[in-house]
Amino acid sequence: MEHVAEWNVHIYLFEHDADTTLARAVMETPATKLTAEGTARRNPADRPVAEIGDELAVGRALVALGEQLLNAAAGDIAALR
């Protein structure tokens, strides 16, 4: 039997202040809900380009989410032994 599933990740962006962007990645599956956050801070010497802060914050949130998924899988594998 073929296993087919769809997991969605929702990304929420927040401008904390003029130089700080926060991102939250939320993934819900039938079995669990994982949430991870990422932050980007603009160097005052750099030009303000919102898209760059968004990309950095989201990328960091997704990396953290990936780490949580890998840890969850490792725990599930250990529980099978």
Task: Name each model feature, range by range.
Residues 5-9, 52-53, 75:
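Aromatic-residue detector
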Residues 17-19, 46, 54, 76:
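Acidic-enriched, low-complexity/disordered segments with a strong bias for Aspartate over Glutamate
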Residues 20-50:
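A short, structured beta-strand/loop element
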Residues 61-81:
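C-terminal structural segments of small proteins and small subunits
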Residues 1-30:
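N-terminal segment of the canonical double-stranded RNA-binding domain
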Residues 48-67:
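Short, well-ordered alpha-helical segments
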